[in-house]
């Protein structure tokens, strides 16, 4: 191949999905020239599967991205067509915002943002090779022979590496939605010593809206009050588009069971691992054979299209079987398929080869993010992209990496799980993965992370001022609630209506709000000094902090214990073979993962509590020797 110098940049980002977009915007906004290469400019921030952002655990990630100065939250606030808060019957720790996206507008708005970023250059092209000299990345080579040099390179290749589509007996090399696959980069990465693996995911069919019998399906109404994803938006008003709910039938299950032998997964054509928490419909029917039916959600793909997404109905069965299956579902008897379902298989890296900064351990200045790292989902990808972008800049500057631990953010949980434990299937974020979810709520992501984003230069002055104002409102309101007392004469009529125990002596509003049956709203008439300009976010924070005070304090004590082990740092160059007392498996795992702290070491599969005790003794001996020398 004849090559030529395409240009020199501080950072080269490979891929323009959700990881690539956040990575490129972060590096450019931090003042570094960035080249962003993508297989197709028409697929920037594409939503190839579910047309939604957020959901359980994922909504937390979007809020954290926003708090750090990322773009995903702002973009979905501009382009959503329906918004719902999930898990509202449970406590605030698991409340998760989810928005149905207009997928075309989502792409357009994100592309516009990238095009208008001064330090960012967008280019359509396929990267086929990576230049590495002396274990340090120097740039990338495209299919047309252009070499783009960079001080750091971020791989955000999504599901495109050697990607292959499966529909029954039919399979062919392709990216999602009929786009080109990237067929060459995987082998180059293997040659550079990267341990690659094969994962799979899938997407359901899209059907024509006019072919649905809406009289037979249930409408799923949106929330009246729209809660924005971005902390920069106080309130949003928009006419929303509903989703619908239906169910499979006995006939659906019969068709699937009779054709299981034609499923690419059950035929054995697909040997890779799929996402546990997003199984295909044939997998659900085999695994849960006792269930007479399964829920199916029908979701619009946008305001200007009649394509409808059938959530919960992904499959790798042949196209003609898909037609029968879809038409056996209640309300879809005359459904017309516009895009058939398919499974897609792709290459990704074993994430235990990455540092917590998302830098590849054996190749300096090469970072990676998103589905390439073994995760699933747009939100997980965007979170990693943001962190990879930040850390690429910090590496160029010669500064320490920016790492969030498990007690600081869901982003910290996500990355720690990937690089410490690895994953044998596409990793999905859920609230249950966090040990400290009462502290890591989606509503307080700005209070946890905005200060950090500001220090990095990603949070601009207007956002920072809004954050400071919210903090001040919370502080002042908490003080007011503690010092404002109400008498039994005033309080008891309100308490009676709320079926709350009457009081015999005066009580502060703070103590009244501790009662689970009382809310900010139903004590309004006995709260004569409530500020009229109190921010809604601040009001919510106060109520949560008061009601869950004891639980939060308990979790903060647990975090203090967690931090003690996290603060016991381990050098990256330790030879664990030389530490007496470690078991062979522990030595192998510790040498492979190279944890940054005793806390991280304790989370590695195969490292026992006894091994951790050995490490603590080793560190104490090192500390004493250092003290004696000094």
UniProtKB/Swiss-Prot annotation:
GO biological process: tRNA methylation; tRNA wobble uridine modification
Residues annotated as binding NAD(+): 274-288
Binding site for FAD: 15-20
Main location: cytoplasm
SMART domains (UniProt xref): GIDA_assoc_3
GO cellular component: cytosol
Entry keywords, A to Z: Cytoplasm, FAD, Flavoprotein, NAD, tRNA processing
Entry GO MF terms: flavin adenine dinucleotide binding
Disulphide linkage map: none
Keyword Flavoprotein: yes
Cofactor: FAD
Alphabetical list of Pfam families matching this protein: GIDA, GIDA_C_1st, SAM_GIDA_C
Compartment(s): Cytoplasm
Subunit structure: Homodimer. Heterotetramer of two MnmE and two MnmG subunits.
Family: Belongs to the MnmG family.
Purpose: NAD-binding protein involved in the addition of a carboxymethylaminomethyl (cmnm) group at the wobble position (U34) of certain tRNAs, forming tRNA-cmnm(5)s(2)U34.
Entry-linked PANTHER family: GLUCOSE INHIBITED DIVISION PROTEIN A, PROTEIN MTO1 HOMOLOG, MITOCHONDRIAL
Name of the protein described by the UniProt record: tRNA uridine 5-carboxymethylaminomethyl modification enzyme MnmG
Lineage: Bacteria, Bacillati, Bacillota, Clostridia, Peptostreptococcales
Originating gene: mnmG
């Amino acid at each position: 191949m004849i090559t030529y110098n395409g240009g020199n940049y501080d950072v080269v980002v490979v891929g323009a999905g959700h990881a690539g977009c956040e990575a490129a915007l972060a590096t450019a906004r931090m003042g570094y020239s960035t080249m962003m290469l993508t297989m197709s400019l028409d697929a920037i921030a594409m939503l190839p599967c579910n047309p939604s952002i957020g959901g359980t655990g994922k909504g937390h990630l979007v809020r954290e991205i926003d708090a750090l100065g990322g773009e995903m939250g702002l973009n979905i606030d501009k382009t959503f067509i329906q918004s719902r808060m999930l898990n509202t019957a449970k406590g605030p720790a698991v409340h998760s915002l989810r928005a149905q996206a207009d997928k075309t507008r989502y792409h357009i708005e994100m592309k516009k943002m990238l095009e208008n970023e001064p330090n960012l250059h967008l280019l359509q092209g396929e990267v086929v090779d990576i230049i590495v000299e002396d274990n340090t990345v120097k740039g990338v080579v495209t299919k047309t022979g252009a070499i783009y040099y960079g001080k750091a390179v971020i791989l955000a290749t999504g599901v495109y590496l050697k990607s292959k589509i499966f529909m029954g007996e039919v399979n062919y090399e392709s990216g999602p939605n009929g786009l080109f696959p990237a067929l060459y980069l995987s082998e180059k990465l293997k040659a550079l010593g990267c341990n690659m693996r094969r994962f799979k995911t899938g997407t359901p069919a899209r059907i024509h809206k006019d072919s649905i019998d809406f009289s037979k399906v249930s409408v799923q109404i949106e929330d009246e009050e729209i809660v924005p994803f971005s902390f920069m938006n106080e309130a949003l008003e928009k006419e929303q588009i509903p989703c619908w709910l239906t169910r499979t039938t006995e006939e659906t299950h019969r068709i699937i069971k009779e054709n299981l032998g034609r499923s690419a997964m059950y035929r054995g054509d697909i040997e890779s691992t799929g996402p546990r928490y997003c199984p295909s419909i044939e997998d659900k029917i085999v695994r849960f054979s006792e269930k007479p039916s399964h829920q199916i959600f029908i979701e619009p793909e946008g305001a200007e299209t009649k394509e409808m997404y059938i959530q919960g109905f992904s499959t790798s069965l042949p196209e003609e079987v898909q037609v029968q299956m879809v038409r056996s579902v209640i309300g879809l008897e005359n459904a017309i398929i516009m895009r058939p379902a398919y499974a897609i298989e792709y290459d990704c890296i074993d994430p235990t080869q990455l540092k917590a900064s998302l830098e590849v351990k054996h190749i300096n200045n090469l970072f990676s993010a998103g589905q390439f790292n073994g995760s699933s989902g747009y939100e997980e990808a965007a979170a990693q992209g943001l962190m990879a972008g930040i850390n690429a800049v910090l590496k160029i500057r010669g500064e320490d990496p920016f790492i969030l631990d498990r007690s600081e953010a869901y982003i910290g949980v996500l990355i720690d799980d990937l690089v410490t434990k690895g994953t044998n299937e596409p990793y999905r974020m859920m609230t249950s993965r966090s040990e400290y979810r009462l502290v890591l709520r989606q509503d307080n992501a700005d209070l946890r992370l905005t200060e950090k984003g500001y220090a990095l230069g990603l949070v601009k002055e207007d956002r920072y001022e809004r954050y400071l104002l919210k903090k001040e409102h919370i502080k002042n309101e908490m003080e007011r609630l503690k010092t404002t007392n109400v008498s039994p004469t005033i309080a008891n009529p309100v308490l009676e209506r709320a079926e709350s125990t009457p009081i015999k002596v005066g009580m502060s509003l703070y103590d009244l709000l501790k009662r689970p049956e009382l809310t900010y709203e139903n004590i309004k008439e006995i709260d004569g000094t409530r500020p009229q300009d109190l921010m809604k976010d601040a009001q919510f924070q106060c109520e949560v902090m008061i009601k869950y005070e004891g639980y939060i304090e308990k979790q903060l004590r647990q975090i203090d214990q967690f931090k003690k082990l996290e603060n016991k740092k381990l050098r990256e160059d330790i030879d664990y073979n030389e530490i007496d007392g470690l078991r062979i498996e522990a030595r192998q795992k510790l040498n492979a993962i190279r944890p940054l702290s005793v806390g991280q070491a304790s989370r590695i599969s195969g490292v026992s509590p006894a091994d951790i005790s050995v490490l603590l003794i080793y560190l104490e001996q090192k500390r004493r020797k250092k003290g004696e020398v000094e």
